Design a protein with these regions (language model features):
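Positively charged, low-complexity terminal tracts
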Residues: 1-64
Length: 64
């Protein structure tokens, strides 16, 4: 992943708090922790990423 240039983005709502950053590289979605940019990167296919976003939207991951 480091050999491919990526434009990392994070939510403007995160401020200076730790947050995930997302990059779209080579038809895949990469995520990493903003406070550890040289740390591990998770790679997802577009289908996996869409499934994750659908879960977020419907509250599947809410800690209640």
């Amino acid at each position: 992943m480091e050999s491919i240039p990526a434009v990392w983005r994070k939510s403007t709502l995160s401020g200076s708090n730790g947050c995930i950053e997302v990059a779209f590289v080579g038809g895949q979605v990469a995520i990493r922790h903003s406070k550890d940019p040289s740390g591990p990167v998770l790679i997802f296919s577009p289908t996996e990423w869409e499934a994750f976003l659908a879960g977020v939207r419907c509250g599947e991951f809410d800690l209640r």
